[in-house]
Swiss-Prot record:
One GO biological process term: CMP-keto-3-deoxy-D-manno-octulosonic acid biosynthetic process
Pathway entry: Nucleotide-sugar biosynthesis; CMP-3-deoxy-D-manno-octulosonate biosynthesis; CMP-3-deoxy-D-manno-octulosonate from 3-deoxy-D-manno-octulosonate and CTP: step 1/1; Bacterial outer membrane biogenesis; lipopolysaccharide biosynthesis
Catalytic reaction annotation: 3-deoxy-alpha-D-manno-oct-2-ulosonate + CTP = CMP-3-deoxy-beta-D-manno-octulosonate + diphosphate
This protein's name: 3-deoxy-manno-octulosonate cytidylyltransferase
Length: 255
């Protein structure tokens, strides 16, 4: 099995402008992501951007860069443009690694690609990890996922799912039940190129719009998403200045 990694990198960010170029331990953040992805078993790692500043920095450290349109409405549309530019085959597998994940373990990149190759019923694969704290369970910025016993995603939501009705019917309950199966969705995906080609022809789905979750467009069109628990802990990405300082501290101690 072979696969490609595409790292989308946008310069504009409301909370952290110029995020991909932020310095972390002497390197721009996008370089850390690229180096982590290059430690996976990917056939090639490509940075996709619509910004000449990111292109120049990435090419300076030796990355392959594909320039994309600035008008894409979603990251998946951008990914599809890259696969078209590269001339990838319909059955090729592409892993989308976010450009703000400088601590992404290479093992999970391999895992999500391998899982898609092994589960032929699925057009997309992704990962999750357990939720242990009630605060995280209720946090709408932490996306929850439920799946069937074969790992087929049933739903993704910002709402707290599954809801332990009887547990919370008790007075003064402020913890999750023991061995509770809540899972946090980790935003790494592998796709079959054919799925990307179909995705860009679909209108936005109602549930996708309500939840502001792009993956719900896939489920709304009766395509299967495989979900598995990540084989390694995936530290959070960088969305804010506080996140940036946290990642810097972790890299200083050799994370």
């Amino acid at each position: 099995m072979s696969f490609y990694v595409v790292i989308p990198a946008r310069y504009a960010s409301t909370r952290l402008p110029a995020k991909p170029l932020k310095d972390i331990a002497g390197k721009p953040m996008i370089q850390h992501v690229y180096e982590r992805a290059s430690q996976s078993q990917a056939k090639a790692v490509i940075i996709a951007t619509d910004d000449a500043r990111i292109q120049a920095v990435a090419q300076a450290f030796g990355a392959q860069v594909v320039m994309t349109s600035a008008s894409h409405s979603s990251g998946t549309d951008r990914l599809q443009e890259v696969t078209r530019t590269l001339g990838l085959a319909a059955d090729d597998i592409v892993v989308n690694v976010q450009g703000d994940e400088p601590l992404i373990p290479p093992a999970v990149i391999n895992q999500v690609a391998t899982n898609l190759a092994a589960n032929t019923y699925a057009s997309v694969a992704t990962l999750s990890e357990p939720i242990h704290y009630l605060e995280d369970f209720h946090n709408p910025n932490i996306v929850k996922v439920v799946a069937d016993k074969a790992g087929r995603a049933l739903y993704f939501s910002r709402a707290p799912i599954p809801w332990p009705r009887d547990h919370f019917a008790k007075p003064d309950v402020n913890v999750l039940p023991d061995n509770f199966p809540a899972q946090r969705h980790i935003g790494i995906y592998s796709y079959r190129v054919a799925l990307l080609d179909r995705f860009v022809t679909w209108p936005q789905a109602t549930l996708e719009s309500i939840e502001s979750l792009e993956q719900l467009r896939v489920l709304a069109n009766s395509e299967a998403i495989h979900v598995a628990e990540a084989c390694a802990q995936v530290p959070g990405g960088v969305d804010t200045e506080a996140d940036l300082q946290r990642v810097k501290a972790l890299l200083e101690v050799g994370q």
